[in-house]
Amino acid sequence: MDSDTSPNPFASSPPSSPSPRPSLPPPVPRKPSSLVSAASGSPPPTHRASFPDPARHPKMGATVPGPKPKTGYCCSIDKDISAGEQVHIVDALKTTEGGTASYITYVIRLGTHTVRRRYSAFLSLHQSLTGLYPVLIIPPIPSKQSLTDYAVKGQSKAREDATIIARRKRLLEDFLQRLIRHPILGGEHVLHRFLEEDVSWSEVLHSPPISLLSKNPLHAPSHNPTFQPTTPTSPSEAPATTSYIAHHLLPTPSPSHPLRQPDQRFMDSEAFTEKFQSHFSGTMEKVNRRVTKRWGERAHDMSELGGIWNGFSLVEQGKLGDAIEKVGRAVDAEYLATAALLQSWEKTTTEPLHIYSQFATLIRARLSFRHQKHVQYELVQEALETQRDKLEILENAEREARRLEEALERGGSVLASPQLEPEAARDERERAQRRARASQGFGLLSAVKHSLSGMIDMDPEATRRANIAKTRDNISQLEDSYQAAAQDLKYASMTLQADLDRFQRQKVADLREMAINLSQVHRDWCKQNLEAWKAAQAAVREIDPHPNRPAQTQTQVQSQQSHAGPSTLHAQTEDDVSKLGVDAMKNEIERVEIEIADKPLPKPSLAETGGDGVVPSPQPRQENDTEEREGHGPLGPL
């Protein structure tokens, strides 16, 4: 197998290498869902999957409650989606409602519900769903017009371009269809409000849950980004506030920060997604643009050629003129069929390729978010270990100080300190090494700071005890943050892997459908051209045959048509035609020779025999003939 070919990591498989996992109990198993792929064309799910809470038994009961599982339909839109209603964008209208400048609104229809939304509403819906579900793959929407379009066409013309509007209608409809088919996104009430008539979308954006989203998704729970603390009125509400603070104390790592113990499954997923994006964006889309460009140039040339043939048909008369006109019509029909081919090609091939290029970018963003959650977990874990080592050193120092103080009080009877056990010595060396790694790069500054604090500190015992209390508080906060990071990492890994599996099934079905549609487009193009050229062939056969070639009899033509099918008849080569002409000429020559052999030879006349009945032999031709001397050829003067 080629070394560049790697197995698909999106498929569910056991991890090839262990990864750091929080010490949490396994999640409560759920009943198998009857959900299907968004691209399979099967009926929608009969029930919605719940948004799971990954922490069933968290530390000290401190947890972030997740959204409650749905037990029924939240609105009529949800009921229609579950019943299998399809969403369509039926029209695009130009309007000036709510302002002086005109803009385009898209008419959305779902069952009996009809609503109008502009492009900015679709964009805000995509952004809102991305914030509400940071570890789910949100379908892409078409991008805005480029600055080149505005510069070339102008702002108003670019917005009202019929081609751009038609393309946006198709892509926005695909976006909505993928949303309602998603097992979790299809049950989101924000989407239902978007599809509901007489609902102000601006009010939806400024009301919960969208208004509760954190500015930084890394500081919010992955399974409930809209979680907000409440003023604790009872001891049972205090853990929720503690968890909220723990999430906001998490660090904000860079997406390129390396991991000490990466998860091999997601490393494979990142590598596969990078190849996937490079293949679609850098190879398939580029080749597809080049092919469609050449088809467009060919269609333009065929339109010019058809005009030339039609103009030539006006010069000729009779059967030849009719045949030339039919050939011109066939060329025009091929031009029209090619134009229709390009339109269908854009719908069935170009747009799906672009959608999956956008999907690759979105998946990389989701994998990057999960990577940052993993980095958060490792950073908090390392900081917690450092603080625990620091606390142990401070406590040992405190115990040693108390022992010395007790020894001094007893009159110095015990001055020698006991030797450390070998195991304790090893632990001390390991802690020293971890402290050295943690403070690497700040050695000189730490030494100076320690010396100054030792000279200035007038009460080292009180300072040491204050440091112990402060370190214990830091450890308590880090333990809460560690628990929150562990929950987020576990939920992000499980949910993202499940959505990657769903996306892989959807991708296979979509690529299969794209290949079938492309073959059907070419088949229709061939059918249209075949009919047009058949009509031209019939007109050409009505023309009289070439005078230097014997015409075929009707019996021969019928015999050839009966023995040869339509494909064989149209694929007949010039060699076959010339062979038939040579055979006919041979038959004609044999017939003439037979007729000549049957006729008697004529008797010579007296003038030819010279009166004696003997035919004189022909005289040899003189080399210096008079005509040749005068420069005349055998056909006359040169």
Curated annotation (Swiss-Prot):
GO terms for cellular component: cytosol; endosome membrane. Residues 1-69, 215-239, 408-432, 545-638 are annotated as: Disordered. Gene3D superfamilies: Arfaptin homology (AH) domain/BAR domain (1.20.1270.60), Phox-like domain (3.30.1520.10). Residues 1-14, 225-239, 552-562 have a biased composition (Low complexity). InterPro entries: AH/BAR_dom_sf, PX_dom, PX_dom_sf, PX_Snx41/Atg20, Sorting_Nexin_Autophagy. The PX domain binds phosphatidylinositol 3-phosphate which is necessary for peripheral membrane localization to the perivacuolar punctate structures. May be required for cytoplasm to vacuole transport (Cvt) and pexophagy. Belongs to the sorting nexin family. This is Sorting nexin-41. It comes from Cryptococcus neoformans var. neoformans serotype D (strain B-3501A) (Filobasidiella neoformans). The gene is SNX41.
